[in-house]
Amino acid sequence: MVLRILLRYLLHNEQLVQRLADSYPFRRAAQLTASLILRGKSLGQESLELMSTSSLLRKLVERLSQTGEQAKQFSTEKAKRLEEAIKDMKRKQGL
């Protein structure tokens, strides 16, 4: 209880608060706090950019693999049709 009253008195003393604010340790603590906040903000933005880039890259890789699979299926279908056409021509020539 006494500590609370003492702290309230010290915090409401404008001269003491101003002296503490002008002191090097408090200014340095404020500088470090501000720099940490700004670094955290920039790191957060960079990580968001990387996450969006990585998701775009992942989508691009998926589309490329799908396109590759579609091209492979298309080529195998064409090869099968060509083989069937050759077999049909051989049968027709054989008759």
From Swiss-Prot:
Entry protein name: Protein NCBP2AS2 homolog
State the InterPro entries in the record: NCBP2-AS2
Q: Which organism is it from?
A: Ixodes scapularis (Black-legged tick)
